[in-house]
Structure formats: C-alpha cells, structure tokens
C-alpha cells in the first residue's frame, strides 16, 4: 500500500509537469513512479503511470514512444479484466498511430476503443479514471480524426462532446470549444470559427485562463490569418483575438 501511495504521489507531480509543458521533468518523475508501482505489484497504479508516460511522450512529439506506452496499457492485466481500461489503452494507441500517419491502424484502434467502451459498466474504479466518460471518449476521438486530416469528423465528435460534457467542467468546455473552432477553421468555415473561438475565450474563468485552450485558439488564429480572408467579421476577430492570445 505504501509503495502504491508513493507511486501515486510521484505521478501527481508528473501530471503537474505535463500541465506545465515540462515533459522532460515529467519523464524524470515517471521513471521513479514506474519503479515504485512495479515494486507495489499494483496493476492499476502501473497502468496510471503508463497513461502519464503516453502523455509526456506525446507532448515531446515522440509518437513512437507514445504508441509503445499505449501498447503496454491495452495489454495490461487490468485492461483484460475491465473494458474501460482496455478502451483507454486503445484510444491512446489510436491517437499515437494517427500522429505517425498510420491511418488504417489508427482507425482499427479507434474501433477497438469504441467496442471496449460500449462493454464497460459502472463498477467502482480508481478516482482518476472518472475523467474517461462519453464526452471525453468523443473528444479523444476528435483528436484522432484531426490528426488524420478529417476535420469534418473531428467537428462531429466535438459537437457530441459539448452536448454531453457535465455541468461545471468549464475549463474542459472551453478547451473543446477551442478545438471546435480549430476544426471549423481548417475546413474553411472562417466566420463560424471566429464565433466559436470568441465563445471559447468567453468560457475561460480568468484572462490567464488555460494554457491549452490559449494554445488551441492561437493555432486557430494562425489558420485564419493564413487564409488571407478580408471578410469584416474575420478581420475583426483577428484584431480582437490578438489582444488575448
């Protein structure tokens, strides 16, 4: 029990490093966390560390390593016992494969994630797994579609996310609204993307807001600026967004 707690504490520090966009520091924490999780022989704690390993590798754009971590997740004993853990492992795998531009494998993994998610029940699980609900499933699916260049499917998934996201999760709603704006911009729906981007910014609880949301809005703005559109609404949003991006 003590070794598991140590692993969880170190994993929490790693998660904070990932949020701070310091994947190198996160990896240092995760190497230690993996050691303690292994010594504890707790398969759930080990799975949790590998989930963070995937995120840290993805943040460094080391997608081959991220896929290797996802393979460990989906083949773990807890994934064999519980379809929800299997689904998350397949979903992480799909995202990594999509970023490696391996579309057939990515879509197969996404389908596996969908099948496993449909089999999952409401049994008691570790608290951290509570994030992986239907709204998050659709959000992560949208990232697969976006990485494969299918921004229409990404937009569809994000609309599903925003329709089912729990009340009170304002930061998540802001983030996924920003991703919706980005998918719209990449389809050439510039005026709509501007309106959606403005909505995302309005959801942020403070001017500093969320770095992930700000980064996504910055990517949206870049797409819109690059388009060269001279539409009045687009020009207005470019000027306005420059003050808070």
Features from the language model and the residues they span:
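Conserved binding/catalytic microenvironments
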Residues: 1-245
């Amino acid at each position: 029990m003590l070794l598991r707690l140590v692993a969880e504490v170190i994993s929490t520090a790693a998660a904070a490093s990932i949020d701070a966009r310091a994947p190198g520091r996160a990896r240092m924490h995760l190497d230690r966390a993996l050691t303690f999780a292994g010594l504890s022989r707790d398969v759930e704690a080990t799975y949790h560390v590998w989930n963070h390993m995937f995120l840290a590798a993805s943040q460094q754009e080391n997608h081959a390593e991220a896929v290797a971590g996802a393979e460990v997740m989906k083949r773990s004993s807890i994934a064999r016992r519980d379809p929800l853990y299997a689904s998350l492992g397949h979903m992480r795998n799909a995202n990594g494969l999509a970023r490696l531009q391996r579309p057939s494998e990515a879509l197969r993994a996404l389908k596996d994630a969908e099948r496993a998610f449909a089999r999952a029940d409401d049994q008691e699980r570790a608290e951290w797994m509570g994030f992986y609900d239907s709204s998050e499933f659709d959000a992560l699916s949208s990232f697969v579609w976006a990485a494969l260049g299918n921004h229409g499917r990404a937009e569809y998934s994000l609309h599903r996310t925003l329709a089912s996201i729990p009340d009170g999760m304002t930061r998540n709603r802001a983030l996924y609204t920003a991703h919706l704006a980005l998918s719209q911009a990449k389809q050439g729906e510039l005026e709509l993307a501007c309106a959606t981007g403005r909505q995302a910014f309005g959801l942020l609880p403070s001017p500093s807001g969320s770095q992930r949301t700000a980064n996504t809005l910055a990517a949206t703005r870049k797409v819109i600026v690059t388009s060269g559109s001279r539409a009045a609404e687009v020009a207005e949003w470019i000027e306005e967004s420059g003050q808070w991006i």
